[in-house]
Amino acid sequence: SCAAPQPVSERPGSAKTLAMMGFVIQAGAFAQVDNAARLTERLNTQGLGATYFKASDGLFKVRFGNFLSKDQARARALTLQKDGIIQDFYIVAPEDYVAIQGRRYGTDYIRTSLVKTARDFIGVPYLWGGTSAEKGFDCSGLIMTVYQLNGLDLPRHSAGQYEAGQFVNRNDL
């Protein structure tokens, strides 16, 4: 027998703060999207969880990792460079992200950037379990990527995203 759907319980509106991204390796900035896609795929075959995106300067940039210190990120990048997996790299610091800048400019600044980043992925196909712009995203993979590109470390799966978020009453939307 099938049970009737249960209503989603309302969680108390306790304020939550998402974890911030740490230091990230950027291993490419390309004029051609195909080059970024190839590097991303190569990095992902190494289990690095890379993604690419189109930056405001028009270049397609490839990023991966989430390190506690710049030294850890640099050491990992140098190892990958020595192994011939990446060539040039740049370490993205937490203060470079919109989430940190939003402390100065306010939450509307962050919201606007999240929407702009998500719009940059319009046209990328839906793929169940997908987490990349080259093959496709599922809903939680897209949201995770958009948040990470803005400096907020959101879990991969929708259940974790739900738990990381803050309940908002329908009337407050």
PLM ranges: what are they?
Residues V33-T40, R74-A77, R111-R119, S140-M144:
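Extracytoplasmic/secreted envelope proteins and their assembly/folding machinery
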Residues V98-Y126:
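Surface-exposed beta-loop interaction hotspot
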Residues E134-L149:
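Active-site nucleophilic cysteine motif
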Residues L48-F53, Q87-V92, Y126-E134, L154-G160:
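Surface-exposed patches in mature extracellular/periplasmic domains of secreted proteins
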Residues G129-F137, E163-R170:
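A glycine-rich, coil/turn loop motif that links secondary-structure elements
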